[in-house]
Each structure stands twice: as C-alpha cells, then as structure tokens.
Amino acid sequence: MSIIKKVRAVDLLYAGLDKEIASFQEQTSLHCKAGCGKCCTHAEVDASPLEFLPWAYHLFLNGLASKTLDDLSIKSSAICHIYQPLSIVDKDNGKGKCSDYVYRGLICRLFGYGANRNKFGEMRLATCKIIKEEQAANFEAAQKALSNGLHVPIFTDYYMKLSQIDFILGNQIVPINTALKLAIEEVLQYYAYRPFPRGFKNCA
C-alpha cells in the first residue's frame, strides 16, 4: 500500500472515531478543561508511528519533514514534540495545546473519551485526574452509563483497526517522540526513490 493510501486510511479511521467521541461527549457532558494540556506533558506517553503518519506526510508536503526530524534527533525532553505551552512560564504547569491538533495521534484522540476493559471484563473510562475530580458527577454518571451499555470508543478495538492498515507500523509501540521520528523517516524513505506527489516539487 502506498504512503498516500495509508494516510487516507488513517484519516478515515480518525473521522469515524471523532464522530464517536463527539456523540460520547454529547451524551456524558464530559469535556477537556479549556487551555489544559496536562496529559501532553507526561514523559511516558507511548504511540505507534502509523498514528502519526498523516502528520509526517503533512510536514513532508510543506517542506518541514527534514527540519522536524533534525529537531527531534537533538531533542532531550521526553514530552511530545508537538505539545506547545501557552508561554514559557506555563512549560511545566500543563497549560498548553497541541501545535498540530488536526494531525494528533490515536492515543491523543482516545485518551479522555475512550475505555479499556478491566480484568473482570468491565468497561473503564480512561481519562485524566482533572476530569475525574472537576467533573466528578458527570464522570460517575458516564461510568455508570458504560455499565448499562453506553457506546464508547475502545482503545484495543481502535489499535486493532489501525494495525490492519499497516501491521508493522501499527504495532510498533514506542515513546511518542520516537514514534514521530519513525513516521517522518517512513515518509522520507518512501519518497527517496519515488517521484514527489503531483504538484509538490520542493517537499521534504
């Protein structure tokens, strides 16, 4: 499968997920706190290269792939490279946003509004401490609704769907900045000996 077909397949998967999440939010009234990027500041977020392939392809088309790869190669922080604090003083307090929100990965989309099954087979919402504490009533109501059959995106289901697009790239779970690097490298290597996409002569 070509890179562009993989990108379109991932985009299509995300489009369906975004609709599911919007429906879940509407039914539960759960939402991220405005201006909060606390979950993005965790240093132990893992992801697959495939979920960031649309982001890497976007960089490539805009001539930013090689530069971003260089930046990632010298980056010492484990915090996601795409995360952008609102200001210098907000660097460590969780106030920030994704600088490429449209192209955020699967883990970024699922966390907060996706669920996993516990050892008893029960659905447990995977969300942050802030939502659990500041939206406690809605969170408890949502958790109860899950037990009663409310539809919610499931992490394992979506990662299985992702791996069906590319088994290797979809199952390679690594630290998030490594995933970003591998996604860019995949695009650059693909076009190293192939013509650039039509209409894009100065990519990379």
Language-model segments: which ranges?
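Short loop/turn segments that flank or connect secondary-structure elements
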Residues: 1-34, 38, 42, 46-204
